[in-house]
Amino acid sequence: MTMALKKVLAIVLAGGEGNRLMPLTADRAKPAVPFAGGYRLIDFALSNLVNSGYLKIVVLTQYKSHSLDRHISETWRMSTQLGRYVASVPAQQRVGKSWFLGSANAIYQSLNLIHDDAPDIVVVVGADHVYRMDFSQMVEQHIASGAKATVAAVRQPLNMANQFGVIEVDQNDPQKIAAFVEKPASTPGLAADPTQFLASMGNYVFNADALVEALHVDAERLDTKHDMGGDIIPYFVDQGEAGVYDFTLNDIPGATERDRTYWRDVGTIDSFYDAHMDLISPVPIFNLYNSEWPIYTRQSISPPAKFVRGENNTVGTALDSIVASGVVVSGGIVEGSVLSNDAYVAAGSRVQDSVLMDKVRVGEGAVIKRAILDKNVKVPAGAAIGLDPALDKARGYKVTESGITVLAKGQVVPEPGEAELALSAQHRRGLPEAVKAATHDDPDIRDSAEKVAAGIQSRVADAAAQGAAH
């Protein structure tokens, strides 16, 4: 049977808690975490499947799935009369009284979905990675190879081996897996590049009957964690029936040379932050603006973003940033940041190298640097976030080892004291980094810009003093 005649069912594993992304996952499943101003993490997996031509998709959910289920129902509506659907399927205890015990058990408990649709091929993908991929190319290789299971693979730095499934390729057949170990303490590097190893992307293609058989075998075992990477893939490797798909071979329309093999696991706060910073350069490491392979999401009903002068005639600006619908920058300065829908940045404030989610409000003269603020956080005037790790920790904010400060959804920011006001005032001085770079070779323009900045800061200070007097 040719690929065009094969029936394909896609299963998205979206039940993970995402403990390493806390506090962003305190009230939502990891695939529902907002990303890049207006998306949810799951939008990347679903967009890739839809763009690949796969329009029968089930999403297996479990942990705090309300916002995820709502997003899927409001965003991913298809014509069910034509046999197309994206269906959110929660844990239902169809097999015994337990909830999903692992990724493999999630599919095992949902085998009725496979039996009902009777596909030839099952594509299984994770819901929390940022990338573009044409799965039809992977399916085509899978069918041609005769393998019963195929794993998508990407090269990663050797020091990250303990975070991924590690693939060893058969020396006589580069499309066959010789060994697969889930998250080993260490692993040898590739022969072609000893600094890298071949990591599983968590994306799989199976012959449907072979997958069903493997899941039944796994369910009967006592020595299993019911995990796709830890148990099901090794089962096929032991049988000599597991293939590997090299992600670098995947060809995406409209991709740039820089982002064509981009894949980011955003399972930690630091990697989540870094993925945002990958978006904002003029030639980004990952290009959101590829209209030939769009990433779909629910369209905001908010009005366009607006940049206006503040009450003290300070100019609202955003440099090297992504700004979503409904954002108002009223006399503040935004640099190297991502602002989600309906965020507000007041006069004299500065947001630098940060991620602000929906409806975050930044008060006058506040400074935010290298921080992630979840929805509905209100930052009072003159506050300093991300400038002093000890101060941030004392106020109950999460601070990562690399120095990223994270505020949870709706977290209360206390009014700043004198020391904090002085700290934020110190960091408001001077030109934005982007302006410094742009005027590096023109001292006259740099001097003029510095005078304007000094004037703005003086007016902000005067306004703050007047407010304190009253």
UniProtKB/Swiss-Prot annotation:
Homotetramer. GO terms for biological process: glycogen biosynthetic process. Alpha-D-glucose 1-phosphate binds at G165, E182, K183, S200. The lineage of its organism: Bacteria, Bacillati, Actinomycetota, Actinomycetes, Micrococcales. PROSITE patterns: ADP_GLC_PYROPHOSPH_2, ADP_GLC_PYROPHOSPH_3. Pathway: Glycan biosynthesis; glycogen biosynthesis. Belongs to the bacterial/plant glucose-1-phosphate adenylyltransferase family. It comes from the Bacteria. CDD domains: ADP_Glucose_PP, LbH_G1P_AT_C. This is Glucose-1-phosphate adenylyltransferase. Its EC number is 2.7.7.27. It catalyses: alpha-D-glucose 1-phosphate + ATP + H(+) = ADP-alpha-D-glucose + diphosphate. Involved in the biosynthesis of ADP-glucose, a building block required for the elongation reactions to produce glycogen. Catalyzes the reaction between ATP and alpha-D-glucose 1-phosphate (G1P) to produce pyrophosphate and ADP-Glc. InterPro entries: ADP-Glc_PPase (IPR011831), ADP_Glu_pyroP_CS (IPR005836), GlgC_bac (IPR023049), GlmU/GlgC-like_hexapep (IPR056818), NTP_transferase_dom (IPR005835), Nucleotide-diphossugar_trans (IPR029044), Trimer_LpxA-like_sf (IPR011004). The gene is glgC. It comes from Paenarthrobacter aurescens (strain TC1). Keywords: ATP-binding, Carbohydrate metabolism, Glycogen biosynthesis, Glycogen metabolism, Nucleotide-binding, Nucleotidyltransferase, Transferase.
